[in-house]
Regions:
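An anion/phosphate-binding loop that grips the pyrophosphate of nucleotide cofactors and donors
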Residues: 115, 177, 290
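Hydrophobic/aromatic ligand-binding patch that stacks against planar heteroaromatic rings
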Residues: 35, 190, 252, 286, ...
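Aromatic- and Gly/Pro-rich donor/ligand-binding loops
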Residues: 16-23, 27-172, 219-222
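A conserved, positively charged/aromatic
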Residues: 171-176, 287
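Short, Lys/Arg-enriched N-terminal segments with co-localized hydrophobic residues
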Residues: 1-9
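Active-site donor-nucleotide binding/catalytic segment of nucleotide-sugar enzymes
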Residues: 119-166, 196, 200-273
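A donor-sugar binding/catalytic signature common to diverse glycosyltransferases
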Residues: 280, 286-314
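A short beta-strand/loop micro-motif in the catalytic core of glycosyltransferases
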Residues: 177-184, 294
Length: 314
């Protein structure tokens, strides 16, 4: 892909799914803000936290005996989710320049952040299978009309939008954009079907070199805290806990005489070490030092490429 987008000496507010609890969401958000600031801009990330993307509640009032049983059965899992959310949030507070919290589109419309440019992206902000895909906030439906509105490496995360009603809604809401850049060729096709011209734009994580990532996240110091010493390992980052990744990992570990480390949201029984509570900095470090990354994650693959680590996409 290519990068045709240049920004300098502007006040820019970006909006993305920065509150999602996964490594890619937080790291691409950080990378875009970091790069824009490096280009000489004043940058803030809109801290948009709609109800569907909020911190998981540890407790809630069950409406039936069935719900009560479900609450207790899933309590350990919910506890893990709350702990992970705290870890992700601490990363964002330390590394990402956030605005005040906005809980819904009305709050954004009533008190929009001041900026020269509103920038939507990156990541799956327009994914029509998720609620954010038809949330007006991610289509910049707020703020003064004279503010420039652009997207940066936005993704629909699908090859086509089959739901006609959603497709029409998205088409109408893209009208307010002055420029649209997207992450995938498939997104260009979707835009063309809607009558829009778009450009390909690399994901923000590629805007930083490996050396810049090392410095920006202080990786050398953080690596020491993980306590991994001279261990050869293949790293598993598996969104779906798939049997296919398991078989590939076991075979790779056997053939290459290396351990299996996991950085998934749940422990894997076949892994030698599980880093369930790794923060985004640990995630980058674990990829950087791996002999191979086996994943079904876009950003897992991206960081393997950045650090020139072998990878297998499953």
């Amino acid at each position: 892909q290519k990068n045709n987008t240049r920004y300098s000496a502007m006040k820019i507010c970006t909006i993305t799914c920065q509150n999602a609890d996964n490594y890619g969401a937080r790291l691409q958000c950080f990378a875009l803000a970091y790069w824009l600031k490096k280009e000489g801009n004043e940058v803030e990330v809109i801290d948009y936290q709609p109800d569907y993307m909020r911190e998981p509640n540890l407790w809630y009032i069950p409406s039936s005996v069935k719900e009560l049983v479900k609450l207790f059965v899933r309590f350990p899992e919910r506890l893990c989710s709350v702990k992970r959310h705290k870890i992700y949030s601490e990363f964002s507070k330390k590394y990402i320049p956030l605005t005040k919290v906005y809980n819904n589109i009305n709050e954004l419309r009533n008190d929009p952040p001041i900026a020269d440019i509103y920038l939507a992206g990156s990541d799956q902000i327009w994914n029509p299978t998720f609620r954010n895909g038809t949330d007006p906030a991610y289509y910049l439906d707020f703020g003064p009309e004279n503010v420039q509105r652009k997207s940066f490496s936005a993704s629909f995360a699908v090859s086509s939008i089959e739901n006609i009603q959603k497709k029409l809604w998205i088409k109408n809401n893209l009208k307010r954009f002055d420029k649209i850049t997207v992450r995938e060729q498939s997104a260009l096709k979707i835009l063309k079907e809607m009558g829009y011209d778009g450009e390909l734009q690399d994901d923000p994580v590629f805007m930083l070199s490996a050396e810049e990532w090392n410095r920006a996240l202080n990786l050398e110091e953080s690596w020491k805290k993980l306590g991994i010493k001279n261990e050869k390992y293949v790293l598993i980052y598996d969104f779906f806990l798939s049997d296919e990744i398991k078989s590939v990992a076991l075979e790779y570990g056997k053939q290459n005489n290396c351990k299996i480390f996991s950085v998934c949201h749940k422990s894997l029984s076949y892994a030698d070490k599980n880093f369930v509570y790794a923060d985004p900095v640990d995630f980058v470090n674990l990829i950087k030092h791996a002999c191979c990354v086996i994943s079904n994650s876009f950003h897992g693959t991206c960081f393997a490429m950045i650090y020139n680590v072998s990878y297998v996409i499953v």
